[in-house]
């Protein structure tokens, strides 16, 4: 009797293992993990919700910043990394691959009560490097300019400093860890200036035109708004994604996703 029970138990375990192998018992089989750029919150959340509704596959998003997301892919801690800058040469050399999902404007933002409405790239650079320190020098109030930016490793910061040619030269008063924090800080200080993803900008701040061009989907698409950068999906070159992650990746980069990407305030790459 004991032998029969033991045999039945072994058969049951074997059967369970076989079912697991065929349909997948791990929760990760039905979950796609993404990690990285805080600026990509709106577009990834929208794409994830639509994908989950259609497939039943859960998409998680860990808003850690571009640099941390790239590192997470490299270390195998997530399926797809999210970066609001192109990969650097050394990152590509380490075995990573970038696929551009969309293009986003970096809005130069001030408090709504600030009378300044337009700056050129050269003036923005002079402000952030400390050559221009008072708003009165650019047609504003007689007040010290408070420089708000992102932390080192941020894709938004990398894009902003690359475009304005201010790498390692900015005199930040505060270096914040998310797009939302920059917007909130500028909204609460009449003398502050900051930069943030256009897709995340709210009515609590005022976006400036740059060289006479306001940031919008149209001006980003035609290139006339010059302060823009890519939203990049980061994966390991030569390494297969899980079936669920591959399905999500293919969905995001298909024309089917373009309407959702546009609805999130950014310009689809394809």
Predicted segment positions?
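C-terminal motif of bacterial Sec signal peptides marking the signal peptidase cleavage site
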Residues: 20-24
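Bacterial N-terminal signal peptides that target proteins for export
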Residues: 2-12
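Exported/periplasmic ABC-transporter solute-binding proteins
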Residues: 26-270
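Intrinsically disordered, low-complexity segments enriched in Ser/Pro/Gly/Ala and basic residues
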Residues: 8, 25-26
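Alpha-helical transmembrane segments
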Residues: 15-19
């Amino acid at each position: 009797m004991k032998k029969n029970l033991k045999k039945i138990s072994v058969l049951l375990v074997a059967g369970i293992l076989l079912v697991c192998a065929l349909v997948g018992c791990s929760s990760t089989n039905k979950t796609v993990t993404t990690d990285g750029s805080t600026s990509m919150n709106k577009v990834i959340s929208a794409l994830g919700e639509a994908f989950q509704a259609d497939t039943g596959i859960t998409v998680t998003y860990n808003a850690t910043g571009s640099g941390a997301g790239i590192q997470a892919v490299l270390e195998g801690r997530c399926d797809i990394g999210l970066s609001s800058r192109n990969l650097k040469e050394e990152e590509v050399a380490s075995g990573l691959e970038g696929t551009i999902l969309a293009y986003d404007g970096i809005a130069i933002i001030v408090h709504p009560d600030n009378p300044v409405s337009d700056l050129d790239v050269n003036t923005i650079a002079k402000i952030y490097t400390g050559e221009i320190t008072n708003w009165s020098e650019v047609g504003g109030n007689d007040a010290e300019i408070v420089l708000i930016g992102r932390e080192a490793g941020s894709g938004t910061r990398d894009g902003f400093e690359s475009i304005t040619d201010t790498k390692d030269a900015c005199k930040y008063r505060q270096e914040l860890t998310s797009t939302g924090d920059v917007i909130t800080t500028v909204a609460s200080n009449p003398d502050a200036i900051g930069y943030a993803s256009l897709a995340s900008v709210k009515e609590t701040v005022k976006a400036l035109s740059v060289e006479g061009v306001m940031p919008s989907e149209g001006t980003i698409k035609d290139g006339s708004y010059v302060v823009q950068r890519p939203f990049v999906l980061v994966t390991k070159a030569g390494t297969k994604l899980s079936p669920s992650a591959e399905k999500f990746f293919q969905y995001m980069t298909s024309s089917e996703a373009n309407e959702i990407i546009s609805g999130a305030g950014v310009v689809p790459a394809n």
